[in-house]
Amino acid sequence: MTAEHFPVTELAKDLISRPSVTPLDEGCQTLMAERLSAIGFNIEPMIFEDTTNMWARRGNQGPVFCFAGHTDVVPTGDISRWHTPPFEPTIIDGYLYGRGAADMKGSLAAMIVATERFVTKHPDHQGSIAFLITSDEEGPFINGTTRVIDTLEARKEKITWALVGEPSSTLKLGDVVKNGRRGSLTGNLTIKGIQGHVAYPHLADNPIHKAAPFLAELSQMHWDNGNEFFPPTSMQIANIHGGTGASNVIPGALEVMFNFRYSTEVTAEILIERVEALLKAHELDYDISWIFNGLPFLTGDGPLLDATRYAIHQVTGYDTSPQTTGGTSDGRFIAPTGAKVLELGPVNATIHKVNECVKVDDLEQLALCYEVILEQLLC
């Protein structure tokens, strides 16, 4: 059997062919549920507004090993720039092309196939295996994993270890696993002024001029030094808007959106206090609101990281590098429950781009890694 016809490749193609642009699922979870139900999983759909979620579990005892992931994908972008139609999975020169190939339908296929193989070999495995799948990871993440976790917490159902299938690898499969993520905090700031004619500045109050010294100081502030696991906290101004578009009107307000990616050396509360103290020091008239996107988390040495290191070495022959760089993932909603969380998935070079693709051989290797991890933890 060639790699093009491995079970993991066939399942990945079936998932990719479903145009599940967030928050749509387009039957992906039904397909997964059918495969899992056939090997003894209890399937629990959880529908919250426009979002399709699935909690599937095999076993009633702890520890609970959970595969976590998402069936939704980002929009395709300009279809004319794709070599092949984004929802018609195509293999070219050993790569599987299609939206979601790397992020993260390839991982979902590898999870299912690995679990099928594991259960066939070890029908009386220890503990429980679970799947937490959502169609709201690429969107506003309001009705997805966070709502499922709330449901599980309310009935005191705990996850021991969670493996998220996000594309963690950089140059080759398994070279990087994410064993933590920085926290994310967004500020939406409005600096108030008085609109007027540019020829009569004494009758107006320009919020851009007033805010400029504050923004300059904010952008130069030192927040912390990071630590051995996390880089220093960073702040980036993402959007600035002021004015009517006319050259002869002083704007009445300036809107600024900025985002922190912060380490465990600070808290969101400390960052908020420092920003608002700076606003007051510059004597600005302002409104500000804050969006908490996720707390930082870290999974150190222990059974999950040990099993993942071992699996990658056994399958690929090289050692992995645990890192906390990059954006946020749904792991940030699982970690606060006390679960240990890691991310392991394909190479991320083409995610969210046109011509997204994944190496076909990598999908089979990823399934093998997942299977070895299960064996290390539940046998």
From Swiss-Prot:
Kindly state which keywords UniProt assigns to this record, in alphabetical order: Amino-acid biosynthesis, Cobalt, Diaminopimelate biosynthesis, Hydrolase, Lysine biosynthesis, Metal-binding, Zinc
What GO biological process terms are annotated to this protein in UniProt? Answer: diaminopimelate biosynthetic process; L-arginine biosynthetic process; lysine biosynthetic process via diaminopimelate
Which Gene3D superfamilies has this protein been placed in? Zn peptidases (3.40.630.10)
Question: What EC number(s) would the UniProt record show?
Answer: 3.5.1.18
In this chain, Zn(2+) 2 is annotated as bound at 103, 138, 352
**Molecular function per GO:** acetylornithine deacetylase activity; cobalt ion binding; succinyl-diaminopimelate desuccinylase activity; zinc ion binding
Subunit structure of this chain's protein:
Homodimer.
Q: What is the protein name given in its UniProt record?
A: Succinyl-diaminopimelate desuccinylase
Question: Gene encoding this chain?
Answer: dapE
